[in-house]
Amino acid sequence: TMMPPKGGQLRSDMMAFLSKQSHKRMTDPEMGKLLDSLKSQNLSDEQAANVREVSRSYDKATKLPEELVEEKARHKSQAQQIWQEARAENDFKKFQPSLEKTVELTCKTAEYYGYEDNIYDALLDIYEPGMTVSQLDPLFAGLREAIVPLVKAVGESPNQPDTSFLDIGQFSEEKQREFSLKVAESIGFDFDAGRMDTSTHPFCSGA
């Protein structure tokens, strides 16, 4: 957030290096042996769940070559800075090559993970383990069938909410910051342990 623009290249190099080192640690054969040994232990439900999820991560990590992990991390960092510039200039074409490269690297990742019917199955499994496109499509089709007519009916209804309070104009960055600080303080945010800055896109993170 506070990094000067010319620090982008160094950041991308550092992110690539750290991702490479993390991948080496995660894919160490010793990690696999430790996970296998834990599966035969008398674990609590919570411990068993932890072992299961780490095993999933280990399995996926070992399918990816180190070079791809490094390239993805470097590109992600570089693309973020280009996106920030393109957003400020309202120029999508400036970001388009980076987005295309992101899709290309994501497809490579999916190929390494492997799939049976649809390339998206490999990516969907990251967030919804076991889910496939063939299972998901009927679900969304059913939702569309029910929701689209509902939204249309709501939009055409004579009983519309009063939204005039939304049409009061733009808010200055200073006023937005002032409001955000008050909200943070009201929920007990500790400014001795954290800070609030202005960024291209809102987010919250911690360490």
Question: What residues fall within each predicted segment?
Answer:
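A well-structured
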Residues: 1-129
